[in-house]
């Protein structure tokens, strides 16, 4: 079952309130971020946990326990996953985690963004870019690398819907604009 956006938002709000009440904002934020990445492109796993015909509920809940408890995933997140399994709505887990991450980020003086590049960037390079962006916007920045083949060279960083463009393509566009402006 696919949940509506307002229901997904309610789940994220509930988990956010628990995180604040139990003073575990940072822990749940880190875990939400990791789980979002872990569940990306894991359609078969999500289907097994979502659809009743695949396995009975006890087996699906055991899969949750076996898979996530070994990584010390927060008990409240685990319980939310189990309820989603019961509701046959585990397909929404990643969306709920994304909303949760967004809400917790606001509370933790942190933000997430994307660094676009023509090829994959090393973890060390991402960390260096994160540090520079953190200084620039006075917030801790966590970046995810995504590939954009339209960039000619360089990188483009998007944080808070603001684009910081260091790509060759943007420089060429800027030169083109200046030439056209002078005509």
From Swiss-Prot:
Tagged with keyword Iron: no
Membrane topology listed for this record: Peripheral membrane protein
Keywords for this protein: ATP synthesis, Cell membrane, CF(1), Hydrogen ion transport, Ion transport, Membrane, Transport
GO CC terms of this entry: plasma membrane; proton-transporting ATP synthase complex
SUPFAM superfamilies, A to Z: N-terminal domain of the delta subunit of the F1F0-ATP synthase
Molecular function terms from GO: proton-transporting ATP synthase activity, rotational mechanism
Subcellular location: Cell membrane
Statement: the UniProt record of this protein carries the keyword Cytoplasm: no
HAMAP family according to UniProt: ATP_synth_delta_bact (MF_01416)
Record function comment: F(1)F(0) ATP synthase produces ATP from ADP in the presence of a proton or sodium gradient. F-type ATPases consist of two structural domains, F(1) containing the extramembraneous catalytic core and F(0) containing the membrane proton channel, linked together by a central stalk and a peripheral stalk. During catalysis, ATP synthesis in the catalytic domain of F(1) is coupled via a rotary mechanism of the central stalk subunits to proton translocation.
PANTHER family: ATP SYNTHASE DELTA CHAIN
Recorded family membership: Belongs to the ATPase delta chain family.
The protein's assembly and partners: F-type ATPases have 2 components, F(1) - the catalytic core - and F(0) - the membrane proton channel. F(1) has five subunits: alpha(3), beta(3), gamma(1), delta(1), epsilon(1). F(0) has three main subunits: a(1), b(2) and c(10-14). The alpha and beta chains form an alternating ring which encloses part of the gamma chain. F(1) is attached to F(0) by a central stalk formed by the gamma and epsilon chains, while a peripheral stalk is formed by the delta and b chains.
Name the record gives this protein: ATP synthase subunit delta
Organism listed in the record: Mesoplasma florum (strain ATCC 33453 / NBRC 100688 / NCTC 11704 / L1)
């Amino acid at each position: 079952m696919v949940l509506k956006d307002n229901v997904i938002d309610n789940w994220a709000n509930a988990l956010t309130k628990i995180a604040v009440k139990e003073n575990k904002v940072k822990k749940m934020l880190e875990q939400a971020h990791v789980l979002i990445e872990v569940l990306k492109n894991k359609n078969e796993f999500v289907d097994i946990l979502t659809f009743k015909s695949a396995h009975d509920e006890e087996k699906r809940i055991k899969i949750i326990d076996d898979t996530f408890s070994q990584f010390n995933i927060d008990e409240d997140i685990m319980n939310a996953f189990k309820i989603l399994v019961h509701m046959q709505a585990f397909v929404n887990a990643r969306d709920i985690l994304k909303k949760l991450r967004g809400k917790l980020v606001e509370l933790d003086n942190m933000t997430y963004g994307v660094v676009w590049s023509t090829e994959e960037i090393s973890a060390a390079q991402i960390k260096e870019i994160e540090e520079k962006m953190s200084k620039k916007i006075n917030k801790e920045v966590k970046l995810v690398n995504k590939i954009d083949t339209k960039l000619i060279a360089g990188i483009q960083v998007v944080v808070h819907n603001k684009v910081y463009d260091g790509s060759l393509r943007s420089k060429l566009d800027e030169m083109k604009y200046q030439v056209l402006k002078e005509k």
